[in-house]
């Protein structure tokens, strides 16, 4: 528990919930044999990889699930505050869902995994999907007009592919997206040390004196991560970003994720520091919104992830395999790298492999249309937050009050009853 524990209205339940909620998250679902499968895939020995998650093989999901159900039962029987009881019930059900997800991975049950992913993250929005495809087609037309050689050939192939997808369904959409040109030719590329300096400035700006910014010298991940438990933001030593990108990510990680954690812990509700059930859309949507205020090109990654997930799930009625999405990723790299997105990866095949593996995380890789679906959250959450801010429904101070979804009416009503909002 933290320094505010004495004033929490949920102190009776929070500590026990925290103990039981500690389990592998989706970001840790990395196939143990991914390097072997990568080698076989590149040699053409297999059409699609078969991922094995041995590190999850011995996780006691059944015992943890039973303990969570017992805690939920205790809260239902002993908690007098009906609204608090409901919020904890929803949060615990999310953790039970996590146990079910781990079980489906252990059993290599793609059908069950897909069912649970849909339960957690929902289905693809056809309106958003068609708008994203149109945005890609429009951007590719510019590439075709202004490029030549291999870049133009890849753009023409990808445009033809997406145009065919688009022709299979006709949906009106109120959404209109544009990929932002982000050429970094004139931008200075920062190393991990340079990125750390910018993060330190942002940390001081927000008065986050308890937090540390560190460079990870040994980790393999290329993603900047926030580790709330010991108040650290970790930057991989090989990370390279332009100055605008680094400033935007500092706003994303420190300005939103860390500040919401700190502000949530300072309220009377301990759960608000770790997140109400279903808070992710608000959390990532707000982070993307503020990131985009600093760096317009930040929206491109969300559009790309939504496009690829939509193709996997079959936005046009045809589900797709690992191999087909890998091919699309290669074409994106060849036709749009340097113009619509920047990456340190120099090889199209290594870029495509890394992106596709992330999309199919948790699945075996053998079943068309089965992927993590988590990538849907970023663009959908951004659109929800954008609407709330444009309508002035909540102030910036209220948006940052803790980890909840400002677009979730139940969250807002609950927090207003507690006078947190």
Describe the role of every protein-language-model region.
Residues 201-210, 257-265, 289-301, 391:
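Secondary-structure boundary elements
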Residues 58-64, 68, 244, 259-283:
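Post-HEXXH active-site segment of zinc metalloproteases
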Residues 82-241:
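Contiguous, non-catalytic segments that form substrate-binding/exosite surfaces or channel walls
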Residues 301-421:
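Conserved alpha-helical "signature site"
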Residues 195, 218-220, 233-235, 279, ...:
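Primarily short, surface-exposed interaction patches in extracytoplasmic proteins
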Residues 245-259:
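Short alpha-helix carrying the canonical HExxH Zn2+-binding catalytic motif
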Residues 1-156:
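N-terminal low-structure segments adjacent to metalloprotease catalytic domains
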Residues 273-317, 381:
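Post-HExxH zinc-binding segment in Zn-dependent metallohydrolases
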